[in-house]
UniProtKB/Swiss-Prot annotation:
EC number: 3.1.-.-
GO annotation, biological process: mRNA catabolic process
TM regions (residue ranges): 3-23
Domain KH intervals: 221-281
Organism the protein comes from: Lactococcus lactis subsp. cremoris (strain MG1363)
Gene Ontology MF term list: RNA binding; RNA endonuclease activity
Listed Pfam families: HD (PF01966), KH_1 (PF00013), RNase_Y_N (PF12072)
First-level EC class: hydrolase
A Gene Ontology term for the protein's cellular component: plasma membrane
Name of this protein: Ribonuclease Y
Subcellular location field: Cell membrane
Cysteines paired by S-S bonds: none
Length: 531
């Protein structure tokens, strides 16, 4: 074999090997392409599936958002509808109240129109009477002139009197006759005017009173506190009676525990003390912690709470009578009258009633109705402080009105409503009349309880008049007086002498049935705080 053949053979082998390698390479590339295609197809399927899931999720979220938006829109629509309905109801209620006020105003105007019509009719009647009387007098004058002429001629003929003498005689006789007739006419007119004035006054008072609706409730000197069970009575009494003794000493109120089921009675003449005791006992029963320290804490807390409540009572009463721009201190002082009685009549209710009656009287008389109501409302304000400040309630009330710069008419009304000072205005007279009407109406007052309360107050006043006495409480319906002294002012030996002195003063200055027990208490406390 020659070289060419060998070369050709080698070339052939190379070609065959290259072809085989090329074929394998093509096959491998095809497999790689198929693998890449399958992988791309799988990824595309995954992307499509993910996109489909995302689309379904977005669709569900859109549906949920749509439902939520529809629900929110429905809620908002219902809320707006309710607000509109409430606003409509409120406006309709306001419209009804306005119509009611207009109707009341119209009724007042109708009554005033009727009154004016009656006055006009009375004036017309009086005018007609005057015209008739004038005509009668004219005729009488003509008759007298004719008679006078006849007399003159007769006298001249008979007595040969001169003209001047005859004229004097005739005038004298005529004057006497006219004087008698005039006196009779004046007397009849005065009697008629007096009858008309009495009738008019009764009519005005009737109109003023019938427009005031008042309660006839007598004040009591006891309060009842309900208990959850009878076992609570023992806890109120405490070990060896220490709880009930502390309670009575701090409040000055008798605690009556008897066989009445599930109830305790608080007895005391001072309504403020009794209210503090009632509030304290109810809170103790509700809380369940009943011991001297807790009792002392609640008594002090309720004293402050009652001060706030008294201001609310004063503001409510002032709003009811229309007494605007009252000084806040005056409102608080007026609120104290809610817990003050006069012959069993609540003084704050009495003041409101006097304000309404005085306002109605002023309206009928053409006076300032608002000023009359304000004067009537404040006329007894001194009674709120008459047991704390020296002087009568009239003097105290006058000084308070001056202090807070009230209208001079209001000041004079307070000073004159019991006749101590001359009234300087019609309003002062009207308030005095309204005060008498309110006190005199049936069921308004009860004198026996007032005398009883005065005796208890006198007991306390005598006891607190001695040096070193801190406070005193009349208990057991006035059969016992407990005197609390300052331990740094009096010794144990001195309180024995004080008890005897109080007893002697009571015997000398008071009239009372039975015996009165005088108890003087001296208590020393040492307080410190562990830190």
């Amino acid at each position: 074999m020659d070289i060419i053949s060998i070369v050709l053979l080698v070339l052939l082998v190379v070609l065959v090997v290259a072809f085989i390698f090329y074929a394998q390479n093509i096959k491998k590339n095809k497999q790689d392409a198929e693998s890449l295609f399958n992988e791309a197809e799988n990824k595309a399927n995954e992307v499509m599936a993910s996109a489909k899931r995302e689309a379904e999720s977005l669709k569900r979220e859109a549906e949920a958002f749509k439902k939520e938006a529809r629900y929110t829109l429905r809620e908002e629509e219902q809320k707006q509808r309710r607000e509109i309905e409430d606003e409509f109801k409120q406006e309709r209620q306001e419209l009804k109240e306005t119509e009611k006020r207009l109707k009341q105003r119209e009724e007042i105007l109708d009554r005033k129109d009727d009154t004016l019509t009656k006055k006009e009719e009375n004036l017309d009647s009086k005018e007609e009477n005057l015209v008739r009387k004038t005509d009668t007098l004219s005729k009488r004058e003509e008759q007298l002139a004719h008679i006078e002429e006849k007399k003159r001629l007769e006298l001249e003929r008979i007595s040969n009197l001169s003209m001047d003498d005859a004229r004097e005689i005739i005038l004298s006789e005529t004057r006497d006759g006219l004087t008698k007739e005039m006196a009779q006419t004046i007397r009849q007119s005065e009697e008629k005017a007096q009858a008309e004035a009495d009738k008019r006054a009764k009519n005005i008072i009737s109109l003023a009173i019938q427009r005031v609706s008042s309660d006839s409730v007598a004040e009591q000197t006891v309060s009842v506190v309900n208990l959850p069970d009878d076992g609570m009575k023992g806890r109120i009494i405490g070990r060896e009676g220490r709880n009930i003794r502390t309670f009575e000493a701090l409040t000055g109120i008798d605690v009556i525990i008897d066989d009445t089921p599930e109830a305790v009675v608080l007895s005391g003449f001072d309504p403020i003390r009794r209210e503090i005791a009632r509030m304290t006992l109810e809170q103790l029963v509700q809380d369940g912690r009943i011991h001297p320290a807790r009792i002392e804490e609640l008594v002090e807390k309720n004293r402050k709470a009652l001060d706030h409540k008294m201001r609310e009572y004063g503001e409510q009463a002032a709003f009811e009578v229309g007494a605007h721009n009252l000084h806040p201190d005056l409102m608080k002082i007026m609120g104290r009258l809610h817990f003050r009685t006069s012959y069993g009549q609540n003084v704050l209710d009495h003041s409101v009633e006097v304000a309404h009656i005085a306002g109605n009287l002023a309206g009928e008389m053409g006076e300032n109705e608002a000023l009359a109501k304000r004067s009537g409302f404040l006329h007894d304000i001194g009674k709120a402080l008459d047991h704390e400040v020296e002087g009568s309630h009239v003097e105290i009330g006058t000084e308070l009105a001056r202090k807070y710069k009230e209208n001079p008419i209001v000041i004079n009304t307070i000073a004159s409503h019991h006749g101590d000072t001359e009234p300087l205005s019609n309003i002062a007279v009207l308030v005095a009349a309204a005060d008498a009407l309110s006190a005199a109406r049936p069921g308004a007052r009860r004198e026996s309880i007032e005398n009883y309360i005065k005796r208890l107050k006198d007991l306390e006043a005598i006891s607190t008049s001695f040096d070193g006495v801190e406070t005193a409480f009349a208990l057991q319906a006035g059969r016992e007086i407990r005197v609390m002294v300052k331990p740094d002012k009096l010794t144990d030996d001195q309180i024995v002498i004080l008890a005897r002195d109080v007893k002697n003063r009571i015997e000398d200055e008071m009239d009372y049935p039975g015996n009165i027990k005088v108890t003087v208490i001296r208590e020393t406390r040492a307080i410190d705080y562990a830190k």
